[in-house]
UniProtKB/Swiss-Prot annotation:
Annotated compartments: Secreted
Tissue and organ distribution: Released primarily from activated T lymphocytes.
Signal peptide range in chain numbering: 1-23
GO biological process terms, semicolon-separated: adaptive immune response; astrocyte activation; cell surface receptor signaling pathway via STAT; defense response to virus; extrinsic apoptotic signaling pathway; Fc-gamma receptor signaling pathway involved in phagocytosis; humoral immune response; macrophage activation involved in immune response
A single GO cellular-component term on record: extracellular space
Positions where Pyrrolidone carboxylic acid occurs in the chain: 24
Name of protein: Interferon gamma
GO MF term list: cytokine activity; type II interferon receptor binding
Positions annotated as glycosylated: 39, 106
UniProt xrefs under InterPro entries: 4_helix_cytokine-like_core, Interferon_gamma
Entry similarity comment: Belongs to the type II (or gamma) interferon family.
Function statement: Type II interferon produced by immune cells such as T-cells and NK cells that plays crucial roles in antimicrobial, antiviral, and antitumor responses by activating effector immune cells and enhancing antigen presentation. Primarily signals through the JAK-STAT pathway after interaction with its receptor IFNGR1 to affect gene regulation. Upon IFNG binding, IFNGR1 intracellular domain opens out to allow association of downstream signaling components JAK2, JAK1 and STAT1, leading to STAT1 activation, nuclear translocation and transcription of IFNG-regulated genes.
Keywords assigned: Antiviral defense, Cytokine, Glycoprotein, Growth regulation, Pyrrolidone carboxylic acid, Secreted, Signal
Amino acid sequence: MNYTSYILAFQLCVILCSSGCNCQAMFFKEIENLKEYFNASNPDVSDGGSLFVDILKKWREESDKTIIQSQIVSFYLKLFDNFKDNQIIQRSMDTIKEDMLGKFLNSSTSKREDFLKLIQIPVNDLQVQRKAINELIKVMNDLSPRSNLRKRKRSQNLFRGRRASK
């Protein structure tokens, strides 16, 4: 790379970093708006300990943490849904919701659609309850470690086969 290329690369980095900082600053501003609206900075908010932080600290393994995070994200989406008609905080909630889903689902549109679909399933609907019970055995089988072990062995065999062929 010549001198001009270095300068152009540096300028690109500066532009990208500053736009990221700007987005981050906007994100924090929206959280501050919500804190102010909900009066969440008062000392009495900490009474009884944290809701999520202590739980998140306990889980280190990525798969375990993802399960906990999915429940937390689901909680926030339900919270935001309860205040969807509040024009004072609507923009803040929308901004945070988009950022949260983007980070949690790695900006995957299909994961986002499926996640939102799952959290909106009405638990009190009799037809939904019947379908859920009907699918329970398949869900339990999918959760079982044995099926994951089989998948892992299959992928290891594929990897070994590729390595041996080289």
